[in-house]
């Protein structure tokens, strides 16, 4: 550990790799609700968060498990199509609560162009939530609807063992990964239908 009179111990959450306080301060200065997006290996989580002196207040939240439970999503919770659908869901939920604009908060995730984090953003914007951004950061349409996964599945199907190993999670739920784009559109339609009044 460093020593000397000029050494400063970083805040605990910074040491633990959980919070970038410089970024957080910049986001809070905007005065807008934050669209907080976090990703794990198997899932995405999105929240609309308001700052309060006593602690941040979560107004609405959505999890990819919700897509599976309430809308019949059979794909993986950590891929780009599920991220877009989650964004669509959190966007409609925010509008339902009267929140029409937000600023994106990706925490310590690297801002990689085309990443699934930005698929969540696209979904929220498509729902009608106003979030400042550049469209250049979005994933391509084929990644959003899962066509790239379907194409890979078609190629891998020739090797039955690897195919079942790679896509066992899809198959056990009754979804052929080659049909993921069609399934994506079905689930997207269900989300839109549920929030039809919000869109009106």
Curated annotation (Swiss-Prot):
Q: Which GO terms describe its biological process?
A: ribosomal large subunit assembly; translation
UniProt similarity note: Belongs to the universal ribosomal protein uL18 family.
Gene responsible for this protein: rpl18
Record-linked PANTHER family: LARGE RIBOSOMAL SUBUNIT PROTEIN UL18, RIBOSOMAL PROTEIN L5-RELATED
Q: Which CDD domains match?
A: Ribosomal_L18_L5e
Keywords for the protein's UniProt record, in alphabetical order: Ribonucleoprotein, Ribosomal protein, RNA-binding, rRNA-binding
Gene3D superfamilies per record:
3.30.420.100
Q: What is this protein called?
A: Large ribosomal subunit protein uL18
């Amino acid at each position: 550990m460093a020593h000397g009179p000029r050494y400063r111990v970083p805040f605990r959450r910074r040491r633990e790799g959980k919070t970038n306080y410089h970024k957080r301060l910049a986001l809070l200065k905007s005065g807008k609700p934050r669209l907080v997006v976090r990703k794990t290996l198997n899932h995405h989580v999105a929240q609309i968060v308001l700052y309060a002196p006593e602690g941040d207040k979560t107004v609405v939240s959505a999890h990819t498990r919700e897509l599976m439970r309430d809308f019949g999503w059979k794909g993986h919770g950590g891929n780009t199509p599920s991220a877009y659908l989650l964004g669509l869901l959190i966007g409609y939920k925010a509008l339902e609560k009267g929140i029409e604009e937000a600023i994106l908060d990706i925490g310590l995730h690297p801002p990689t162009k085309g990443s699934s984090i930005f698929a969540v953003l696209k979904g929220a914007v498509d729902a009608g939530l106003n979030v400042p951004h550049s469209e250049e950061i979005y994933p391509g349409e084929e990644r959003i609807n899962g066509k790239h996964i379907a194409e890979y599945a078609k190629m891998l199907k020739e090797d039955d063992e690897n195919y079942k190993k790679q896509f066992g999670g899809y198959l056990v739920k009754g979804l052929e990964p080659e049909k993921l784009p069609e399934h994506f559109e079905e689930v997207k339609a269900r989300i839109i239908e549920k929030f039809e009044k919000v869109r009106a």
